[in-house]
């Protein structure tokens, strides 16, 4: 399980709320996952949806280092943009500085708006402007047909988030793979606030098989690629047999 710091379904009102949330991500969720034999990894940040209040964002950013030593923390994320606002850009830059200062992997959220392309370009420019940030250690999530090319061309990893109605459906994701190949790209799913299907990735694998893709190709996209990216964190433990 890879669980990024996320929006709570409402905007939190204080840094203490985030402190408690980070305790949940680094202490309670790993224990809960272990009851079912699952390793649990997490990412830390203040989500772009809550980045308009710069004062609150600075308070949250100040407490993140306290949790970065937790054994299940693999990086900073999911950072990025929601409305492409000036304040969101400021908080994004501060997150990138935090990641660069601590040699952390980066997980990026791209906006779900008509200006996703603009937001993705802004994010890539911020990442590339910091010489400490290596593209191969960053995954740009929620790519779609009009943004995946720029992400891969700049050397970053691309994540396709599979949803039944928004973001990217399984069939669209497979079409993208047929155009752009299966290097530095993966699929993911979620249990989200909106309509979502946690089993979307294995369902997509079945559709890939139906289209004639062989087992090795499918395994690379849905399993080996995520393992390759996550293994860049010294805290990620490769599954046995790989």
Predicted regions: what they are:
Residues 93-178, 186:
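Catalytic pocket-lining loop regions of alpha/beta-barrel enzymes
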Residues 180-199, 218:
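Short acidic/histidine-rich active-site segments
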Residues 202-242:
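Mid-to-C-terminal alpha-helical segments outside catalytic/metal-binding sites
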Residues 167, 194-198, 230-231:
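Short active-site-adjacent structural elements
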Residues 42, 78, 99, 158, ...:
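Conserved, mostly hydrophobic/aromatic
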Residues 2-6, 162-167, 191-192:
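Short, acidic/turn-prone active-site loops that include or flank metal/cofactor-
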Residues 34-36, 129-134, 180-181, 210-216:
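Short helix-capping segments at alpha-helix termini
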Residues 1-106, 110, 114, 118-122, ...:
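Mid-domain alpha/beta scaffold segments of enzyme catalytic cores
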């Amino acid at each position: 399980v890879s669980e990024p710091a996320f929006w709570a379904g409402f905007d939190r009102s204080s840094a203490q709320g985030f402190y408690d949330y980070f305790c949940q991500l680094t202490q309670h969720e790993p224990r809960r996952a272990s009851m079912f034999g699952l390793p649990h990894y997490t990412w830390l940040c203040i989500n772009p949806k809550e980045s308009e209040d710069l004062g609150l964002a600075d308070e949250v950013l100040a407490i993140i280092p306290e949790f970065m030593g937790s054994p299940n923390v693999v990086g900073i994320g999911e950072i990025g943009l929601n409305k492409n606002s000036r304040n969101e850009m400021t908080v994004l830059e501060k997150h990138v500085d935090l990641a660069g200062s601590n040699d952390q992997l980066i997980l990026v959220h791209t906006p779900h708006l008509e200006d996703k392309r603009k937001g993705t370009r802004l994010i890539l420019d911020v990442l590339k402007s910091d010489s400490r940030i290596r593209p191969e250690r960053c995954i740009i999530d929620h790519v779609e047909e009009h943004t995946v090319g720029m992400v891969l061309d700049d050397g970053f990893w691309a994540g396709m988030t599979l949803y039944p109605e928004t973001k990217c459906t399984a069939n669209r994701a497979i079409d993208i793979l047929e155009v752009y190949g299966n290097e530095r790209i993966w699929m993911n799913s979620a249990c989200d606030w909106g309509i979502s299907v946690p089993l979307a990735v294995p369902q997509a694998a079945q559709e890939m098989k139906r289209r004639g893709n062989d087992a090795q190709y499918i395994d690379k996209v849905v399993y080996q690629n995520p393992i390759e990216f996550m293994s860049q964190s010294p805290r990620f433990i490769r599954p046995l047999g790989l």
